[in-house]
């Protein structure tokens, strides 16, 4: 089975017993969460979401992605500014699908 779910502002194609990386979610490691914004489940398509369809996931870990380095340079002023950013994420494991 597979499904397309919305988590945050992004859509993810998920399969059972698969891990996905999503934007950071509130919750502790090992906590079970339900994603109820299901756009598609196998061959069923929602308008826009499927009613009574959920994807049950378990939080595996929280972390930070690799650092992105940015440089702001103004040539005439001899100015150089360096920035860095690490995006937080949550790793989810898909346990099962609930539907009617």
Curated annotation (Swiss-Prot):
Alphabetical list of PROSITE patterns matching this protein: RIBOSOMAL_L21 (PS01169)
Annotated Gene Ontology cellular component terms: cytoplasm; ribonucleoprotein complex; ribosome
Keyword field contains Cell division: no
Keywords: Ribonucleoprotein, Ribosomal protein, RNA-binding, rRNA-binding
Membrane listed as a keyword: no
One BP term from GO: translation
Entries under SUPFAM superfamilies matching the protein: L21p-like
Superkingdom of the organism of origin: Bacteria
GO molecular function terms listed in the Swiss-Prot or TrEMBL record: rRNA binding; structural constituent of ribosome
Disulfide bridges in this chain: none
HAMAP family: Ribosomal_bL21
Family of the protein in this entry: Belongs to the bacterial ribosomal protein bL21 family.
Function, in words: This protein binds to 23S rRNA in the presence of protein L20.
Quaternary state and interactors: Part of the 50S ribosomal subunit. Contacts protein L20.
Entry-linked NCBIfam families: L21 (TIGR00061)
Annotated protein name in UniProt: Large ribosomal subunit protein bL21
Biological source species: Mycoplasma genitalium (strain ATCC 33530 / DSM 19775 / NCTC 10195 / G37)
Lineage, top ranks: Bacteria, Bacillati, Mycoplasmatota, Mycoplasmoidales, Mycoplasmoidaceae
């Amino acid at each position: 089975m597979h499904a397309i779910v919305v988590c945050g502002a992004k859509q993810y194609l998920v399969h059972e017993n698969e891990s996905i990386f999503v934007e950071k979610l509130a919750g502790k490691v090992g906590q079970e969460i339900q994603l109820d914004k299901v756009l598609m489940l196998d061959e069923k398509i929602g308008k826009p979401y499927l009613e009574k369809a959920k994807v049950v996931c378990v939080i595996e870990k929280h972390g930070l992605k690799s650092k992105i380095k940015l440089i702001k340079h103004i040539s005439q002023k001899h100015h150089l500014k360096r920035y860095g950013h690490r995006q937080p994420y949550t790793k989810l494991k898909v346990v099962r699908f609930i539907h009617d």
